[in-house]
């Protein structure tokens, strides 16, 4: 309703003042405008006043123009209002739009309704269009920026107690050699492995350094040159080797006669010989206890060493090389103390009969015509994993090293560990029995202070004398991971050697990623088909799950290196079709990742441990105490532990950790703020103005519906009247 404030005080137009019939009428009209109640109670001629108001035009009247329906209401305060319900439908719509133009809080629209002429109105229409176009451009840019779903990474350094991670410890030798050979499949595999290694060694010996003179003619001149051929490995001629021997101590020479093809029955008939792979000669030989690991000043190209340097040797040529010397010190051979010693009875012949292996079984093992020792060992390790998968988990656990045989001493935060309670067994296909420290997810462990003394310190005994011939190194495999994660020692582990104290300094990082639509991370929990049941989701586990599903689908068997799905049997070690199918798809795994057939995202919440490594020789000669379960003299125990034991330290370098969290760079709040800012800048529109437009739309819709219903009622009445 439009109410003209100027009508509150009724002032007739001076030019029409004289047009009143008499002063009585004028006084009556003023009295009517002054006191409506008194006027109704008076004897004023109401019809005369109404006639005067409708007969004369006044400048202040809004209803002076002619209309089809003209009904003005007189209010108590003297105003005159139009009742829109008495207007026609089109006039009512027009009236509402006009009123909206006058009342809206938008800056440009009222100027259209109040424009005095068409030119003025056209200018404002042009300005409104320019502003509307500019606003649309800015609004599109704001929406596009929001749809990018950009994110920012916040890095915080928190000085708080960090939870101690889970530590998984494994022996680099998965199974005990003395136990595993009783298994027929393993015996066959080791037999084929030794024969293949022997052939590879023979071919390498033939390809060792040799010089030959060649003559060739260049421009008519005969030139003699020496050409040096180098084999695959540049190793010395002599190396220590275990052999069965017959020793005659009566002659006082302490030398023994080797029986290289026989397996010794014990330490009484075992000796160490200087073995030459080129000539297969083993000489000299002495009892095992007469050889001592030490350091030599010089070693030649054949690995023959001397404790004392020869006269005239320059200081720059002096080197402290690890070597093994017989008791008199007259004969020394270069030898890494932690390296395995060759067994001649295995090198020259097999202690078991492997004639039962068929040609198909040999082909299934995949050695083929391999001559590279490293590749042969890798293939042999894979074959052992396949063969062991045919056994039950309980059988595999019994064939690997027990908890107390591996873990001798342990302390955490400077206090002794409970080895039985603090370490949990986890069977791994590659490393056999592994033991997890801090496995209980309900117990919170943390370091009191930073440094090695307040972390995990553990002494481990690997028993190198019971290693498989496929175990290339002696030591421990260590993995640092979160309690909820599977350790994956074959992928994320670190190797620590025996005879050293290995220190692993840690720093923790916590990652918090945004899920969809800002990212594609996997939220808490594992996926439904995740093969590592009971563990949190990880990218490595996802890829292994995808690969296992692919192998089962295409080969009909599962890869024994990973957990199976749905009880599918693992691929058999001597099944040629299984092995060829598995090898084929293993080489295609890179293409699978590249073509996104295996789509594995990062977890939304992840704990990462970065590690720094250092080592020192252990135990020291001053450590003259009986270590672990050694009952010998202190010096002998030290030597034994140098070859068979390792000391590990895992600790926090500082009691703080980083928190990396992702957050939305441009959220809905910022988008609405920018949107409203541009809307106010270019159109002068606020949220309240938008509400005004919404109310106008509802009013127009309501009037349209009411008009439609009213028209239907009129038609029904007309039809009913026509029927009568």
UniProtKB/Swiss-Prot annotation:
It is found in: Cell membrane. Residues 246-255 have a biased composition (Acidic residues). Residues 1-122, 706-724 are cytoplasmic. Glycans are attached at residues 293, 369, 463, 605, 624. One of its GO terms (molecular function) is ligand-gated sodium channel activity. The chain crosses the membrane at residues 123-143, 685-705. Residues 1-22, 229-265 are annotated as: Disordered. Changing residue 673 to V: Causes degeneration of the PLM mechanosensory neuron and increases channel current. Residues 1-15 have a biased composition (Polar residues). GO terms for biological process: detection of mechanical stimulus involved in sensory perception of touch; mechanosensory behavior; positive regulation of detection of mechanical stimulus involved in sensory perception of touch; positive regulation of mechanosensory behavior; potassium ion transport; response to mechanical stimulus; sodium ion transmembrane transport. Subunit of an amiloride-sensitive cation channel (degenerin channel complex) permeable for sodium, potassium, lithium and N-methylglucamine, and required for mechanosensory transduction (touch sensitivity). Negatively regulates the turning step of male mating behavior. The keyword Membrane applies. This is Degenerin mec-10. Residues 256-265 have a biased composition (Basic and acidic residues). Belongs to the amiloride-sensitive sodium channel (TC 1.A.6) family.
């Amino acid at each position: 309703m439009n109410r003209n404030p100027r009508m509150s005080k009724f002032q007739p137009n001076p030019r029409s003042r004289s047009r009143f019939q008499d002063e009585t009428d004028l006084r009556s009209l003023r009295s009517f405008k002054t006191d409506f109640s008194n006027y109704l109670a008076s004897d004023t001629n109401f019809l005369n006043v109404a006639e005067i108001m409708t007969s004369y035009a006044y400048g202040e009247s809004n209803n002076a123009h002619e209309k089809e329906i003209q009904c003005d209401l007189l209010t108590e305060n003297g105003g005159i209002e139009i009742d829109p319900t008495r207007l026609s439908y089109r006039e009512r719509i027009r009236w509402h739009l006009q009123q909206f133009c006058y009342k809206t809080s938008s800056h440009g629209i009222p100027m259209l309704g109040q424009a005095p002429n068409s030119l003025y109105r056209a200018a404002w229409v042009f300005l409104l269009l320019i502003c509307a176009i500019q606003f649309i451009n800015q609004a599109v840019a704001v929406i596009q920026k929001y749809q990018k779903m950009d994110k920012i990474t916040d890095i915080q350094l928190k000085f708080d107690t960090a939870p101690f991670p889970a530590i998984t410890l494994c022996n680099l030798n998965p199974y005990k050699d003395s136990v595993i050979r009783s298994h027929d499949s393993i015996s066959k595999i080791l037999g084929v492995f030794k024969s293949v290694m022997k052939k590879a060694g023979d071919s390498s010996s033939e390809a060792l350094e040799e010089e030959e003179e060649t003559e060739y003619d260049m421009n008519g001149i005969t030139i003699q040159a020496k050409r040096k051929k180098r084999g695959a490995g540049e190793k010395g001629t002599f190396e220590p080797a275990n052999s069965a021997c017959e020793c005659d101590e009566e002659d006082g020479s302490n030398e023994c006669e080797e029986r290289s093809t026989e397996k010794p029955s014990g330490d009484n008939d075992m000796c160490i010989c200087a073995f030459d792979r080129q000539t297969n000669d083993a000489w000299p030989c002495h009892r095992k206890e007469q050889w001592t690991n030490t350091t030599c000043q010089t070693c030649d190209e054949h690995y023959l060493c001397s404790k004392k340097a020869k006269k005239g040797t320059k200081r720059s040529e002096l080197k402290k090389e690890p070597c093994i010397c017989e008791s008199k010190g007259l004969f020394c051979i270069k030898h890494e103390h932690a390296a395995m010693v060759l067994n001649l009875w295995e090198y020259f012949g097999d202690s078991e009969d492997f004639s039962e292996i068929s040609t198909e079984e040999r082909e299934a093992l995949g050695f083929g015509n391999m001559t590279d020792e490293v590749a042969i060992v890798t293939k042999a390790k894979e074959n052992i994993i396949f063969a062991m998968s045919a056994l039950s988990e309980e059988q595999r656990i019994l064939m690997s090293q027990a908890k107390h045989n591996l873990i001798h001493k342990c302390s955490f935060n400077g206090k002794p560990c409970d080895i039985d309670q603090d370490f949990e067994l986890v069977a791994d296909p590659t490393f056999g029995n592994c033991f997890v420290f801090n496995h209980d997810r309900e117990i919170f462990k943390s370091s009191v202070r930073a440094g090695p003394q307040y972390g995990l310190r553990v002494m481990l005994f690997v028993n190198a004398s019971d290693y498989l011939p496929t175990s290339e190194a002696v030591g421990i495999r260590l993995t640092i991971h979160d309690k909820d994660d599977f350790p994956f020692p074959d992928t994320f582990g670190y190797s620590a050697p025996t005879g050293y104290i290995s220190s692993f300094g840690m720093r923790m990082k916590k990652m918090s990623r945004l899920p969809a639509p800002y990212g594609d991370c996997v939220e808490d929990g594992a996926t439904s088909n995740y093969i590592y049941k009971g563990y949190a989701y990880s990218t490595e586990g996802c890829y292994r799950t995808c690969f296992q599903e692919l192998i089962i689908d295409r080969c009909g068997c599962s890869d024994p290196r990973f957990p199976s799905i749905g009880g599918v049997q693992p691929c058999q070690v001597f099944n040629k079709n299984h092995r060829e199918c598995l090898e084929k798809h293993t080489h295609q795994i890179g293409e699978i990742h590249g073509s996104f057939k295996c789509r594995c995202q990062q977890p939304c919440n992840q704990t990462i441990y970065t590690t720094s490594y250092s080592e020192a020789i252990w135990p020291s000669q001053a450590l003259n105490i009986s270590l672990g379960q050694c009952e010998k003299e202190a010096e002998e125990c030290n030597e034994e532990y140098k070859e068979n034991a390792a000391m590990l330290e895992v600790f926090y370098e500082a009691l703080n950790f980083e928190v990396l969290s992702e957050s939305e760079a441009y959220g809905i709040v910022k988008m609405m703020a920018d949107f409203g800012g541009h809307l106010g800048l270019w159109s002068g529109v606020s949220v309240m103005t938008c509400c005004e437009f919404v109310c106008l739309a509802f009013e127009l819709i309501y009037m349209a519906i009411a008009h439609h219903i009213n028209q239907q009622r009129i038609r029904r009445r007309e039809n009913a009247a026509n029927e009568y």
